[in-house]
């Protein structure tokens, strides 16, 4: 049997094309960041869509199921298309959509259609289901603590399954997201060591936000939150390519700065948040029952960083110096 010699020219051509595509993506990212720096975050440039009111888990700290969704009728895909078309016609910038829920992958057909309306897409999933190879998508997989803490927060017996799912998709831009609570607060460094090598998109941390109907005991008081932020900043120096958060964002989450950010929440003022019925959720993706004064969601603090020219210049100088 004759063996075909490898087509060297073809391989060089493919490698060249991949390199050009990478440069193009970096250029587009730089262009978008420059626009944000010059003009600020446009209204409705970013937002969240609850894909579904269904989920295969019931996690201890889930803000979504703190509310009753049993009698909700999910908006059909056809109606979602009409809604997204109307948003586009109204000249919404459509820069980034975060697809949440519920478990978004229960209804991945909606994301498959809807993601084409946005330049960038983030899908927040529990990671128990298969992950499609969609371009221009960041996958955020919720891993709240190391295995024992995770079992208490989410469900026993699925931690290793999710880990294998991440390992089997090295081609995807997967971030690990951990919510720090009274159960997971001692897991930070172990989580970074375990998941850092396999999460291409790095690790991000949130703090539990009290929501009506959820266990108040999960919340970490301000001194503990400040201590953990200092620990994360220390670990960032030790694992610079692993923790995917700006220093300025972490500093804004501290007790002496957080209220100024949440009182002027960029998400509440500029983003959209739509529920499974297609209706507006209120002040943010967590709904109107979230305690904004104790918000631990990284999103408004990250948006506040991006909206500040001073902080963005500070981050740029820091990056150039490193």
What are these regions (language model features)?
Residues 12-133, 318-322:
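Conserved alpha-helical substructure of the radical SAM core
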Residues 88-91, 116, 131-135, 139, ...:
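Acidic (Asp/Glu)-rich catalytic clusters
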Residues 55, 141-143:
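Conserved phosphate-donor/acceptor-positioning beta-strand/loop module used by diverse small-molecule
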Residues 55, 59-62, 265-268, 284, ...:
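Short cysteine clusters
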Residues 61, 65-68, 271, 290, ...:
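Secreted/processed peptides and extracellular or luminal domains of membrane proteins
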Residues 47, 97-99, 121-123, 139-141, ...:
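Hydrophobic faces of well-ordered beta-strands that scaffold small-molecule active sites
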Residues 1-41, 284-322:
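Radical SAM enzyme core and accessory elements
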Residues 1-7, 71, 142, 148-290, ...:
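Radical SAM enzyme [4Fe-4S]-AdoMet core and its adjacent flexible, acidic
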